[in-house]
Amino acid sequence: MHEITLCQRALELIEQQAAKHGAKRVTGVWLKIGAFSCVETSSLAFCFDLVCRGSVAEGCKLHLEEQEAECWCETCQQYVTLLTQRVRRCPLCHGDMLQIVADDGLQIRRIEIDQE
């Protein structure tokens, strides 16, 4: 379960930004999860709640967004998007020579803070 490690690192970054902007607490966090990141969203939500306990982000609303993986098809020379690792064929030409160009793992997209 690597979700706990991802959440711990995300919390470090969230706390840094909260301190930088004088936040009393974090009220919302938006995370983008890459299609091929092997992150289980329910586990991520559970771990996030767990690591945030006792921090400036305790009780904040977690918003999760799943991102499609962008790939380059060597066969038809087109950019295509895939939703899952199980589908490894180009949806346009059905070729199997795909190169992942954007999956982005896990990204913090937005942090909402309360400064009062």
Swiss-Prot record:
Keyword Nucleotidyltransferase in record: no
Cited InterPro entries: Hydgase_Ni_incorp_HypA/HybF_CS (IPR020538), HypA/HybF (IPR000688)
Gene Ontology molecular-function annotations: nickel cation binding; zinc ion binding
Pfam families (alphabetical): HypA
Residues reported to bind Zn(2+): C73, C76, C90, C93
Example of a GO biological process term: protein maturation
Binding site for Ni(2+): H2
Keyword flag Protease: no
Keywords: Metal-binding, Nickel, Zinc
NCBIfam families: hypA, PRK03681.1, PRK12380.1
HAMAP family membership: HypA_HybF
Protein family (similarity comment): Belongs to the HypA/HybF family.
Main function: Involved in the maturation of [NiFe] hydrogenases. Required for nickel insertion into the metal center of the hydrogenase.
Protein name: Hydrogenase maturation factor HypA
Source organism: Escherichia coli O6:H1 (strain CFT073 / ATCC 700928 / UPEC)
Gene: hypA
